Amino acid sequence: MTPATTTTTQSIASAFALSAASQALCDAFADAATQAPWQSYICNACGYIYHEADGDPDGGLPPGTRLADIPDDWACPLCGVTKADFSPYEAPTLEALRAQASAAPPAYIRPRDEPGVVIVGAGRAGWQLAETLRQHSATLPITLVTACAGDRYDKPLLSVAMARQLDPQALVSETGRDAAHRLGVTLLAHTHAVRICADTRQLRTTRGVLRYGHLVLAHGAQAALPPGLHASLCWRVNHLDAYQRLRQHLGDQPKDVLIIGAGLIGSELANDLALGGHRITLLDTAAEPLARWHDQQAGPQLLDAWKDLSIRFEGGLQVEQVERVGSRYRVTTTSGQRFAADEVVVAAGLLPPQRLAQSARLDWAQGIAVDAGTLQTSVPRIHALGDCISINGQCSRYIEPIARQARTLAAAILGQPAAPYEHRAAVVRVKTTSRPLTLH
């Protein structure tokens, strides 16, 4: 072969290679252009939002899993329903909500001097009610009062975040400021509600007095502190700020963590802190974890799943004292047993704060007593929903009922046809990733 022939052959080969590379690049751009954007879907039962881009790694769905590709037996991480109960979702803008409210039959005409609705609490319940009200009224003044920043996040995912060592801000789906702007509501963040003056329809706060036409208490429940324990010596992880501080204290090195209480929250925390590399001691007065669901063998199933994790469960023990010894803590039980730990977490149930309810002389029964169908308290124009309420003396501190409660209250506040709330037993999904459980 002559040099000229060799050069020609090389040129042709180079041209073919360049053409192939160009075609591959064009194909890649075409694929990117034609690929459908990631979608979001909302659980019709509890309001959990599934983002295809994020997936549900703890439920076995890697990022990028389309809804159509999700197995039929997959369950909502919060309430346990299947993907059939999910609908397409796009966070509505204020303009869209106004258009929706304007298109609806007029059900509420606000008097000129009507001060509107004041909601105490900007957790799931408070924001759910604000959004439901705005869907039906574009003009109703809505004010949310919250002691925190008011950022929106799914509280049940706090324990899961421990195992994945997520930054707290990664849990925030929408900042309080952005949510307030989108819904056209007034958010008083880092503001404490101090007292209710029911006779004058006023709420006293650390930022002044607010008049209300309707007042809604949605301030949730706090992690209970057993007698004899001091809050300064124990963690209670029931909101984003507490999670952030605990994560900072735990740092990057494995720690000895003692958890008091092996119910739903305590068991999930134990599971996920252990998966995060920490050594866990879990104490409870009952003989097994999740004792409330003893008839469903929940405890034995968990203990079996934990065999390969650094979780030591000790049942039948009542904690008497927690004290600081040097840089660590010593936990003593009523039977005299002692345990040492780097950090102590209390997960011994939830207790709604009573101060506001007492100031308005609201009926109380393990929570703010409300009517089973209307969620009205014992005082006119004061309502409640979420973790802070009790119905016929029974509490239901789960996510699923909140959307239905919000619809009931919105109808009552706006003078629409009644939408009675139906109280029913919740299906509980235990987010212990070692062995997820669905309990009834």
Positions of the model-derived regions?
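Mid-to-C-terminal Rossmann-like scaffold of FAD/NAD(P)H-dependent oxidoreductases
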Residues: 111-118, 388-440
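Beta1-alpha1 glycine-rich phosphate/pyrophosphate-binding loop at the start
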Residues: 40-59, 109-185, 271-294
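Rossmann-like dinucleotide-binding cores of NAD(P)H-dependent redox enzymes
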Residues: 150, 156-159, 171-172, 256, ...
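FAD-site-proximal beta/loop scaffold in flavoenzymes
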Residues: 232-253, 330, 338-411
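Short linker/helix segments within small regulatory modules
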Residues: 58-73
